[in-house]
A protein has these predicted regions:
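Glycine-rich phosphate-binding "P-loop"
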Residues: 44-58, 167
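Active-site-adjacent C-terminal substructures of enzyme catalytic domains
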Residues: 17-40, 64-184
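Divalent metal-dependent hydrolysis catalytic cores, especially in the metallo-beta-lactamase
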Residues: 1-15, 37-49, 76
Length: 184
């Protein structure tokens, strides 16, 4: 018996221009997924331009994914690359939800990315967030809760795409991701 997962990027990350615009538009698909026990893997980031980039995970979880989880309580969901305390809290509040955590969200904070200058190597989506969020992610990652697990989200880009005026989001961590995890 084969199983598969559906990834819903919602036009929020690199190369996801064809993603959907609102989770609730896909209720008929989620109903079938729940019935057939197909998990939903989701990049949880709002695409609303009025939402600050550092608040997009929380906005998406509150406005979109919470409604899906409420309507489909048996649908298994994975929030990919959680970046905030809000993401951790969301997973803990929903027994059918798990979450992946990346090496870069565990080891860096937004000051590393933007201060004293912008570092394209640390630009990813969801963006690296506050130091308090990072500490919460680390505490959760080493806490033993099986709802949380490693998701490397390694995303290499050609040099011209990563360091240009329109730097592509994504961190290539395949070469060192496990070492970062071991250090934590």
């Amino acid at each position: 018996r084969q199983r598969c997962a559906v990834v819903s990027h919602m036009a929020a990350t690199t190369n996801s221009q064809s993603g959907g615009s609102a989770m609730l538009n896909y209720n008929h698909i989620f109903e079938a997924m729940e019935e057939k026990r197909i998990p939903l893997l989701v990049h949880a980031e709002s695409t609303d331009d009025n939402v600050d980039i550092f608040d997009r995970e929380a906005a998406f979880l509150e406005r979109e994914l919470s409604q899906v989880c409420e309507r489909f309580p048996e649908l298994k969901v994975t929030v990919e690359h959680i970046s905030t305390s809000d993401g951790i809290d969301f997973v803990k509040a929903h027994p059918q939800v798990g979450g992946s955590i990346t090496p870069h969200h565990l080891s860096r904070n937004r000051s590393d990315m933007i201060s004293p200058a912008f570092h394209a190597d640390l630009f990813c989506k969801p963006v690296i967030n506050s130091e308090q969020d990072r500490l919460t992610l680390v505490e959760t990652a080493i806490g033993g809760d099986p709802s949380f697990f490693l998701g490397t989200d390694s995303a290499p880009h050609p040099t011209h795409a990563k360091y240009g005026k329109d730097a592509k989001a994504g961190i290539f961590n395949a070469a060192y991701g496990l070492e970062v995890i071991a250090e934590i």
